[in-house]
């Protein structure tokens, strides 16, 4: 499931804080690359099969 994939991603990159935004925002994930700077990616970009 996507939740499992997210957990695996977090475990693989523990230094990156990520927050899953609400579905009404298009299922974006915000990665805090470094303090004060976040990069946004679409959920589907991260977990495509």
From Swiss-Prot:
It comes from the Eukaryota. On the 2D-gel the determined pI of this unknown protein is: 6.0, its MW is: 38.0 kDa. This is Unknown protein from spot 75 of 2D-PAGE of etiolated coleoptile. It comes from Zea mays.
